A protein has these predicted regions:
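Short beta-strand-to-loop capping motifs
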Residues: 33, 138, 162, 252-256
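DPxDG-like acidic metal-binding loop motif
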Residues: 84-108, 129-134
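Active-site rim beta-loop-alpha module in soluble metabolic enzymes
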Residues: 159-221
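Glycine-rich, charge-dense phosphate/pyrophosphate-binding loop(s)
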Residues: 12, 198-291
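Alpha/beta catalytic cores of group-transfer enzymes, especially the acyltransferase/condensing modules
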Residues: 106-155, 241
Length: 291
């Protein structure tokens, strides 16, 4: 059985922990039932019981009421610890494998709930499961709610991926414990307007509401050359550059792609920045073939 999951960018400026967008960068997993858990084509650091795919698979089969083992071959294109939802690709992949190998015992909604529980927030899990542009939130009883939103075809997106990681734990630890009412209200209003801008491809509105006050002012200090990349991108495209998830990847949105000259200027900086033009992945997690 082959399962495909997609990268995602979350937050999208002021939509902290609630907005997420699925991107056409993929991880693929070939999964089969086995006598023991065996992992192929994966770094030694992840070839153990802490592997998120295996953890998610076990969580899934526990919910179904089955105990068994799998062999998994990993073909991964989503970079780790770069703010592109790599953990969600593994978790959603493992849960989907548990479901698909046992008669599709879990619905996509159940997979989303379980994945969000494992992540602790739903902003990457939702687009990874359902695809497209999603808004999500959690209730106090750990019930997660998500809805799919439209996303403008007029927006052109590029991700800029450096050669260093930013761990989610580090990116969360740097944030304040509390915010003033004024900051909270302003950011909430911007998040609402951000959805409108992304749905309608409104670049002028996008520029106004993309200035986040909750996480970006703090997390950008963890991303060396952030200001330089932002300067080059915005001067060339007149768009906006945002931190993807917790970083270190940055994502640019405009009505046109960045020029080759500006791309080279970014790639020639100190951190071996890689530029990839990306599009929205609308399908979410896919079981490509069943055996």
């Amino acid at each position: 059985m082959r399962i495909r999951t997609s990268a995602s960018t979350s937050n999208l400026g002021p939509g902290f922990d609630c907005l997420g967008l699925s991107l056409n960068i993929y991880n693929i997993f070939d999964v089969h039932l086995s006598d023991t858990d065996i992992l192929f084509n994966i770094d030694d650091a992840y070839n153990n019981d802490d592997n998120l795919f295996i953890q998610a698979y076990r969580k899934g089969i526990n919910c179904i009421g089955i105990q068994d083992h799998i062999s998994v071959s990993f073909y991964c294109d989503v970079p780790v610890a770069r703010g592109l939802g790599s953990s969600s690709t593994l978790i959603v992949g493992g849960l989907t494998a548990a479901s698909a190998l046992h008669g599709n015992a879990l619905s996509k909604q159940e997979i989303f709930q379980l994945a969000s529980e494992m992540e602790g927030h739903p902003d990457n899990a939702a687009p990874c499961v359902f695809g497209g542009f999603c808004a999500s939130f959690s209730e106090k009883n750990n019930k997660y709610i998500t809805r799919s939103l439209s996303f403008s075809d007029n927006l052109k997106m590029s991700v800029f991926i450096p050669d260093f990681e930013v761990k989610t734990e580090t990116a969360r630890a740097i944030l304040p414990e509390s915010y003033s009412r004024n900051v909270a209200v302003n950011n909430e209003a911007k998040a609402i307007m951000m959805v409108n801008a992304l749905q309608n491809g409104d670049i002028d509105l996008l520029k106004e509401c993309a200035i986040d006050e909750i996480h970006e002012p703090y997390r950008r200090t963890l991303i060396d050359e952030y200001e330089r990349v932002k300067e080059i991108y915005q001067k060339d495209t007149e768009g906006v550059l945002l931190i993807s998830g917790s970083g270190s990847t940055l994502i640019g949105l405009s009505d046109r792609y960045i020029s080759d000259e500006a791309s080279k200027a970014i790639m020639n900086l100190n951190h071996n920045w890689q530029k990839r033009d990306v599009k929205v992945e609308s399908l979410g997690v896919v079981v490509i073939n069943e055996q």
